[in-house]
């Protein structure tokens, strides 16, 4: 199987058609995504294709494959919540839909369809309905398309009905604000009726709607099967990929799903899907960075700000804040008005404690659009870094009012309440985050912290375990679990957690080693305690740290060597001399122990010749 060498004429034409088809159906974010991806291809290639030329250097045969993460349903006016995760994988079985009209659109474009097709004959009605859609008159658009029979008109009619009923469900839900009878999420009672309208469809766009309704009804497996069928019929509908990603529970499930996608593994769409989904799962790796670099190469989409943003987000999740910051700076240099993922950039500046740059960014973007949730989060981070937590909460709450499904805002609001020692409000914010997306470890971790503030360690432990299951290589989560186990007296489990934390920890880390040494000492397992103290000393000396950082470990090792038979007294003396000659707080104790160890060395030296003589004459 030949791998894809780059973007070819067919890909360029498909992106052009996808932009128009998505726009005609009201999938605005999908249309924006495909058109921006098209613009990221060099104008020379695009113009050559438009003029009927040939991209000989970009000819391709069958593409190969890759892995990816789950974006939210950005293409929907009301973003639907994530369906609950289930363990089994959907089987991609059943026929690929027979979609002659869709294929004709891909080959010729909508404008070249025969005049007798329903879509062409209903074009005036579709145009009028699209105008109503743009004016957010969804019921009126539905009425205009009531007697239309083409698949495009049917899609737009049902999609308008969906948006209208979602808005109604939102209004009814908000009527119960601050009421204990308010359900966790809005309930759309019309979903089953809408599903009945598309349940037997074979059109890829209607299959997408079917998958959307199934996902909202928490029928995840069926939703995944329908969206895979939709992708097989029209692969450049980004909303379908977003919906598919929202159904993915973890990295393992994603790996299994990739083999069910009806595209080669190295197809750009599959690789883009992998990058986005793993970012959404907060679990990218260096492999995703290399995929971004490949797709940003001259043969693919060298000017794609979206891919650059995905690369920056992956670096952020990998805690490479310096490179992530430089990537965002490059994005803003190319487009100073680029708002997407600006909240991630603000998180990076927050972590780096870069107050000046964060303040400048906040003032610049507040002037651009104060009603974007990303910008509200940016302003919230700005106030949080200045320790103005009440103002930070105000802006994070504003972000959730603009988009109830905006996960970061709920999580950051919870963090602010923790800073304010308002555990109950923090728990409420984190629970809202979990309701939006159960795959985000940060909300589970936040719940654990909030319950820890209330000294409810069993509850904390439960939530830390949920977070660890989603992010098994995060040092903080294992440390948090270990501390909870210590608090409830389950010392052996605490030891296991701290040992597990050492696996992904920085090789120069000493805190966890010190905790393990302390626990083993409390259990009178002195040899184990000394082993971890020696590790602390080795790391500190290799890093040329001040003696104060490892003085206690030196004393512990020296004390052990002085107590055990045939202990290494010279090593004990070396460590004690280090501490005694420093300005550590244990200087006095080190000086006393040094006198004792010198006496022991002298006595051992005196006894040794006698023992040798006895051995010779025995």
Model segments located where?
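Residue-level detector of the short coil/turn that links helix A to helix B
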Residues: 26, 136, 165, 218, ...
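Conserved structural position within tetratricopeptide repeats
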Residues: 231-232, 297-299, 332-333, 366-367, ...
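Position-specific recognition of the canonical hydrophobic site in helix A of tetratricopeptide repeat
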Residues: 133, 162, 215, 279, ...
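TPR alpha-solenoid repeat register
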Residues: 153, 206, 240, 307, ...
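Residue-level recognition of tetratricopeptide repeat
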Residues: 150-155, 203, 237, 267, ...
């Amino acid at each position: 199987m030949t791998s894809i060498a780059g973007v070819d004429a067919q890909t360029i034409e498909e992106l052009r058609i996808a932009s128009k088809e998505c726009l005609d159906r009201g999938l605005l974010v999908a249309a924006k995504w495909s058109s921006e991806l098209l613009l990221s291809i060099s104008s020379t290639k695009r113009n050559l294709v438009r003029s009927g030329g040939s991209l000989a250097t970009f000819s391709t045969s069958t593409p190969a494959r890759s892995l990816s993460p789950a974006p939210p349903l950005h293409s929907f006016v009301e973003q639907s919540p994530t369906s609950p995760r289930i363990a089994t994988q959907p089987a991609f079985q059943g026929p690929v839909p027979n979609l002659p009209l869709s294929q004709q659109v891909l080959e010729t474009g909508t404008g070249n369809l025969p005049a007798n097709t329903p879509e062409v004959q209903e074009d005036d009605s579709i145009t009028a309905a699209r105008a109503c859609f743009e004016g957010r008159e969804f019921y009126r658009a539905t009425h205009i398309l009531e007697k239309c029979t083409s698949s495009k008109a049917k899609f737009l009619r049902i999609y308008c009905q969906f948006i209208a009923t979602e808005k109604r469900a939102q209004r009814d839900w908000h009527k119960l604000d601050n009421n204990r009878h308010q359900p966790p999420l809005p309930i759309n009672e019309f979903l089953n009726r809408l599903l009945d309208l598309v349940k037997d469809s074979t059109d890829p766009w209607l299959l997408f709607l079917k998958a959307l309704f199934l996902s909202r009804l928490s029928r995840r497996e069926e939703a995944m099967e329908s969206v895979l069928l939709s992708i097989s019929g029209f692969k450049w509908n980004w909303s379908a990929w977003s919906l598919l990603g929202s159904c993915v529970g973890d990295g393992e499930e994603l790996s299994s799903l990739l083999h069910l996608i009806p595209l080669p593994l190295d197809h750009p769409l599959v690789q883009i899907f992998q990058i986005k989904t793993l970012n959404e799962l907060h679990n990218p790796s260096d492999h995703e960075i290399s995929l971004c670099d490949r797709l940003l190469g001259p043969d693919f989409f060298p000017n794609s700000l979206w891919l650059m943003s995905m690369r920056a987000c992956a670096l952020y999740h990998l805690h490479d804040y310096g490179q992530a910051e430089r990537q965002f700076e490059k994005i803003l240099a190319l487009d100073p008005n680029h708002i997407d993922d600006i909240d991630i950039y603000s998180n990076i500046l927050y972590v780096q404690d870069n107050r000046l740059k964060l303040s400048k960014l906040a003032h610049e973007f507040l002037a651009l659009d104060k009603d974007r949730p990303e910008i509200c989060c940016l302003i919230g981070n700005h106030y949080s870094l200045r320790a103005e937590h009440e103002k930070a909460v105000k802006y994070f709450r504003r972000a959730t009012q603009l988009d109830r499904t905006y996960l970061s805002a709920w999580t950051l609001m919870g963090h602010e309440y923790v800073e304010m020692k308002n555990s109950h409000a923090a728990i409420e914010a984190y629970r809202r985050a979990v309701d939006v997306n159960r795959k985000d470890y940060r909300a589970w971790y936040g719940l654990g912290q909030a319950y820890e503030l209330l000294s409810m360690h069993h509850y904390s432990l439960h939530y830390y375990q949920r977070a660890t299951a989603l992010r098994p290589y995060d040092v903080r989560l294992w440390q948090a679990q270990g501390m909870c186990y210590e608090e409830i007296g389950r010392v052996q489990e605490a030891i296991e957690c701290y040992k597990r934390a050492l696996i992904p920890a920085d090789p120069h880390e000493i805190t966890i080693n010190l905790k393990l040494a302390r626990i083993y000492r409390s259990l009178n397992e002195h040899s184990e305690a000394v082993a971890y103290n020696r590790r602390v000393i080795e790391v500190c000396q290799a890093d040329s740290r001040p003696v104060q950082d490892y003085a206690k470990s030196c004393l512990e090792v020296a004390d052990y060597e002085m107590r055990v038979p045939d202990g290494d007294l010279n090593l004990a003396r070396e460590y004690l001399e280090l501490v005694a000659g420093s300005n550590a707080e244990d200087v006095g104790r080190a000086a006393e122990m040094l006198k004792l160890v010198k006496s022991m060395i002298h006595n051992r030296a005196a006894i040794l010749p006698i023992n040798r003589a006895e051995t010779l004459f025995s």
